[in-house]
Amino acid sequence: MTDISKVIASLMREVPDFPEPGIQFKDLTPLLADAEGLMAVTDALAATAEGADLVAGIDARGFLLGAAVALRLGTGVLAVRKGGKLPPPVHSQTYNLEYGSATLEIPADGLDIAGRSVVIIDDVLATGGTVAATHRLLTSGGATVLHAAVVLELTALGGREVVQPLSVSSLYTV
């Protein structure tokens, strides 16, 4: 186990039977609230983002991590929002959930991502839906997505296969 994996494991809270019976929820809140833990995760994510000139953080904890990584890299950060949170006009990408669908959005005015080299940052890679939708959203706007980086990957849910051929760096896998 790597040093960063040990930090994450020691500060991650496991909540049984949430949000439903049989699910073992992995809560990263204690990690993000710990100054040393947050710095360690920020440094590790930033180390995977070499060459990026923009960081895209996915709603909601990806905002926190993405902003921290962008500061470390000296780049800007783009908040990829859940649908309906931004004023029009927006660029949007809809993706499927287990029951229904969801939408991610970025502003269509005042922001040109064409030609930018972007790294996607999020807290968890589970089914891969949000990372894959973010990838499509950014590339449709002309950006080059270098890769994605997450704190935690839930391997049993197959997200890595869903986002292929996009490469993903995971700091901790379960």
Curated annotation (Swiss-Prot):
Gene3D superfamilies: 3.40.50.2020. Transmembrane segments: none annotated. Its EC number is 2.4.2.7. The keyword Glycosyltransferase applies. One of its GO terms (biological process) is purine ribonucleoside salvage. Pfam families: Pribosyltran. It catalyses: AMP + diphosphate = 5-phospho-alpha-D-ribose 1-diphosphate + adenine. Signal peptide: none annotated. Keywords: Cytoplasm, Glycosyltransferase, Purine salvage, Transferase. The keyword Cytoplasm applies. It comes from the Bacteria. HAMAP family: Aden_phosphoribosyltr. Homodimer. Catalyzes a salvage reaction resulting in the formation of AMP, that is energically less costly than de novo synthesis. This is Adenine phosphoribosyltransferase.
